Amino acid sequence: MVIWFFYGFRKIMHLSLKRIIVKCKMSQLDRTSLIQYFNSNGVLISPEALDKLIKYSSSSLIEDLIKNSDGYIDEKYVERYVSRPKVRNDYEVYLPDVRFNASIEDFRKMFVSKYEKLSKIITSSSSMRGSISIKTAKRSQGEVKVVGMVSEVSMTKNGHKRIVIEDLDDSITAIVMKDRGPVNEIILEDEVIGIIGSVSQSSKDPVIFVNEIIRPDIPYRVIDEEKHEPVYVASISDIHVGSKTFRKNEFEAMVRWISGSDPDASRVKYLILSGDVVDGIGVYPDQENDLEILNPLEQYANLAEYLVDVPEDVKVFVMPGNHDTVRLSEPQPVFPGKIRDLFEPNVAFLPNPYNLKLEGKNVLVYHGMSLNDMIELIPGANYDSIGKAIEAILVRRHLSPKYGGNTPMIPSAVDYHVIEEVPDIFITGHIHSHYIGNYKGVRYVNSSTWQSQTEYQKMMNFNPKPSKLTLFDLYSRSVIVKDFDTTL
């Protein structure tokens, strides 16, 4: 009983310290509170050392100093401690350098990047060996294999499908006859496809009659169940802190669960928040009427305070979405420093989208604005059955296959929406639904929201599926859902 009480007291004191730091990061750290905290732990600290600690604003650093000190901490001790080599993490974060450009040449480079990356994937498949350029195909007879980006799709008056594709040098019309299987395939403008067919020179301009359409697609993956203790990646999205409809009690219950004694909770090593972590302001007309917290920086400070209860050995990754305080156009950058500084050291920040490396596994994280477009473009896809839209993205190996629509894009020399590496796990959000699927061995989720039904959703007759925590085991096929929805 004495041991339990002592451990519980230290844990409570540590959480209160973290809250002191989070609350004070927006202004000046409370020197008096920190001195009292050191004194309560039997440690004296010099004024110079205190200045150093206030600069770093890290509760984990303070705890480590107290744990390893001999009762007195001076400035040199702090400097030696913070300069020690850091332990290597089991994750990698690389931040691409994406600058805002808007010239015609920048758009051209982006489409060239998309074509070259996806063309390389398509031509590496055995069925596309011997592919040639469109210019060469137009001079050929018989069967050809070409790769192109779709610029036009239409139906002829006779019910045939007409597709215009282009590569870096030329374009050609391809016809899918109405009695051929590929006529039923959904072809989107701007996607990159391979075509196997026969060239006809009978008309003024050569035409390819299509026998087969080849997509970049995801190869079938065999998940080797490793003999390894479970390591869980926990996924949530669309928290919307600051909104009057933010489900605060359920979010706190979820964080308490991660910090608790449940065996599954103890296996959570990573927590991913895939965008719209706050509600923001000015996102839509009269939004201020729906807000409990008007200041976006205060919204992030509140989120940071909720996350202090997440154990320090759990790495938290936070990504922006369309409600967050970054540019709307994708790829979205990480949060600015004034927001990042509000959070604890175990919180890392990702751009949107991002391919995260966790213990040798690829975890592709995307907020998911393009899912609205895919629902409109893919027959059978809807907000309650978002899996068809997600799988259409994986088939096309691009997070936003059709340019434009509801997904604004930044033109850049590199197209960061191409899915170059096959993911082990694919995480999305944005829709406020919850859907788990498996496509050719790629486990995916449309992560649950932590916001109740909004007035707009009522008008659209959409019922969100809130307050669900999805756990993926990195070393097996296991997927677990923890439901914190108290309205069921």
Curated annotation (Swiss-Prot):
Keyword hit for Transferase: yes
Keywords linked to the UniProt accession: DNA replication, DNA-binding, DNA-directed DNA polymerase, Exonuclease, Hydrolase, Multifunctional enzyme, Nuclease, Nucleotidyltransferase, Transferase
MF GO annotations: DNA binding; DNA-directed DNA polymerase activity; single-stranded DNA 3'-5' DNA exonuclease activity
CDD domains documented for this protein: MPP_DNA_pol_II_small_archeal_C, PolII_SU_OBF
One Gene Ontology term, aspect cellular component: DNA polymerase complex
InterPro entries referenced in this protein's UniProt entry, alphabetically: DNA_pol_a/d/e_bsu, DNA_pol_delta/II_ssu, Metallo-depent_PP-like, Pol2_small_arc
GO biological process: DNA catabolic process; DNA strand elongation involved in DNA replication
Keyword DNA-binding: yes
Domain of life per record: Archaea
Coiled coil stretches, renumbered: none
Biological function: Possesses two activities: a DNA synthesis (polymerase) and an exonucleolytic activity that degrades single-stranded DNA in the 3' to 5' direction. Has a template-primer preference which is characteristic of a replicative DNA polymerase.
Subunit (UniProt): Heterodimer of a large subunit and a small subunit.
Protein name from the UniProt record: DNA polymerase II small subunit
Gene name, Swiss-Prot/TrEMBL: polB
